[in-house]
């Protein structure tokens, strides 16, 4: 299912294609968030966007009037004690009062903390989408600080990078290609990249190819 919307100029826009182009056409050489190159999966009714530098998965839904960005935190509250949940919900409401456009909500049977923003498809362009994306990520990092979850999300980010490296090894990537990925894509210095790669490949079954 493809969602087409008539923009302000009267032309038809396939938002799945347009947003995917915005997220994948960067160079990873600038500080601008829209210059980051995202891995985007098109699930027809929504897009899944991931970046090795960001410990969150984005889900981008299209409707006739709105583009909705949802950031999954993986933090579920359904089984917490009532006082814990009350404290979390209070902090989320206070965060909502500090941020514009984006809002924290509780979603699903697991009552996961998610962040979402709705954008008007009739007037949406790349700059507005980039501003919304920056707002989403800024709000999420505010949440991390508020709940003192830096270690949790640093570990999640490390696990994502390790999984990506293992997938690339399984696909036949050379050591040079893996180092280039860690240095240019992730932004690590050469020595750190080599240490991480050594640690990963020492545990991987294709080790002989990389010695």
Where are these regions (language model features)?
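Short, internal acidic amphipathic alpha-helical interface segments
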Residues: 72-112
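A short acidic-to-branched-hydrophobic micro-motif
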Residues: 56-78
């Amino acid at each position: 299912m493809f969602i087409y919307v008539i923009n302000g100029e009267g032309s038809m826009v396939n938002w799945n294609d347009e947003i995917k182009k915005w997220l994948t056409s960067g160079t990873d050489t600038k500080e601008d968030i829209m210059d980051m190159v995202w891995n985007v999966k098109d699930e027809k009714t929504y897009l899944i966007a991931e970046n090795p530098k960001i410990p969150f998965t984005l889900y981008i839904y299209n409707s006739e009037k709105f583009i909705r960005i949802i950031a999954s935190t993986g933090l579920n509250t359904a089984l917490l004690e009532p006082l814990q949940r009350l404290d979390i919900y209070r902090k989320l409401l206070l965060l909502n009062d500090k941020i514009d456009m984006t809002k924290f909500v509780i979603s699903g049977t697991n009552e996961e903390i998610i962040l979402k923003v709705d954008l008007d498809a009739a007037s949406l362009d790349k700059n507005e989408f980039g501003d919304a994306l920056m707002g989403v990520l800024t709000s999420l990092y505010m949440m991390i600080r508020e709940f003192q979850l830096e270690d949790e999300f640093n570990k999640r980010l490390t696990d994502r990078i390790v999984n990506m490296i293992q997938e690339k090894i399984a696909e036949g990537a050379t050591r040079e290609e893996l180092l280039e990925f860690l240095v240019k894509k992730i932004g690590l210095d050469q020595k750190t990249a080599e240490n991480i790669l050594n640690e990963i490949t020492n545990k991987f079954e294709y080790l002989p190819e990389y010695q």
